[in-house]
A protein has these predicted regions:
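Juxtamembrane helix-loop-helix connectors linking adjacent transmembrane helices
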Residues: 62-142, 160-164, 235-237
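Short helix-coil transition/hinge motifs at the ends and kinks of transmembrane helices
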Residues: 30-35, 111-112, 162-169
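Glutamate identity and glutamate-enriched acidic tracts
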Residues: 25, 39, 75, 116, ...
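Short helix-terminus and kink motifs of transmembrane alpha helices
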Residues: 23-26, 103, 107, 153, ...
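Transmembrane helix-loop-helix hairpins at the membrane interface
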Residues: 11-15, 122-237
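Alpha-helical transmembrane segments in multi-pass membrane proteins
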Residues: 1-90
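Hydrophobic membrane-targeting alpha-helices
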Residues: 18-23, 62-63, 67, 96, ...
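Residue-identity detector for threonine
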Residues: 27, 35, 48, 95-98, ...
Length: 237
């Protein structure tokens, strides 16, 4: 149907714009020295997350549903429940362990983590103080909801609508690759890491049949990365 072609054009435009703009904005964030500038960045990314990923996904999925299109992903013929449970437990354990480390960290421990943050690709997005942590938590919540709706629920359905359900696996792979590619601003390591995260989220979605669970897992992972690790590095600052 023509609607899938139209949606794909919209999706490609959003992705192209996002790659170009995110890279520029992340460069600005990387150079930002004052917390006011960093907080403006968080607020802007929260807004753009809803505008470019959340809203189009919700509207698109509602339209397709009203048209009678099955917006769930087809069965892949493999029991993914054990894998989904395993990765979920690992993520939860890592988050708890990091939180415990943050509470027990010494001044030297925090300095070491700060040095690692400054060296790692994507480290600039980690909050530096309590004010930034609050905004980073909101950004994590927004990213978890909107990116999962866009890359796990909306994008694969549109691709399947164009190439057919027989090639559903290909559509799923393409959506995971695109999810990694939009994180170009984080460098090659960031692309590979987010690509792996995309695989994990897709496994959870396929195993549960509900977008709710990958959203929750995504939020937890992002909060660990931007908020809990920030607490580990900077304490109650």
């Amino acid at each position: 149907m023509y609607i899938f072609s139209l949606f794909l054009l919209v999706i490609l435009a959003i992705i192209g714009y996002g790659i170009a703009v995110d890279r520029k904005e992340y460069t600005v964030l990387d150079k930002a020295k004052d917390t006011a500038a960093r907080q403006r960045f968080y607020r802007k990314w929260v807004a753009t997350s809803w505008l470019f990923y959340g809203l189009p996904s919700i509207v698109g999925l509602l339209i397709l549903s009203k048209m009678g299109v099955d917006i769930s992903l087809p069965e892949v013929g493999v029991n993914l429940v054990p894998a989904a449970v395993s990765v979920s437990v690992i993520v939860l354990l890592l988050t708890v362990v990091t939180l415990v480390q943050a509470k027990r960290a010494s001044a030297n421990d925090r300095k070491k983590v700060q040095q690692e943050i400054n060296q790692v690709s994507g480290g600039s997005i980690i909050a530096r103080n309590s004010s930034e942590r609050r905004l980073a938590a909101v950004l994590s919540l927004s990213a978890g909801i909107n990116e999962e709706l866009f890359f796990r629920a909306f994008l694969p359905v549109v691709i399947i609508g164009l190439i057919g359900s027989d090639l559903a696996i290909l559509a799923i792979v393409i959506s995971v690759v695109i999810f990694g590619a939009v994180h170009l601003y984080q460098g090659l390591r960031g692309i590979m890491l987010t690509g792996i995260i995309g695989v994990v989220m897709m496994v959870v979605y396929l195993a549960t049949g509900s977008i709710f669970w990958p959203i929750i897992l995504h939020i937890i992972m992002d909060i660990r990365s931007t908020v809990v690790i920030s607490y580990l590095a900077y304490g109650n600052k």
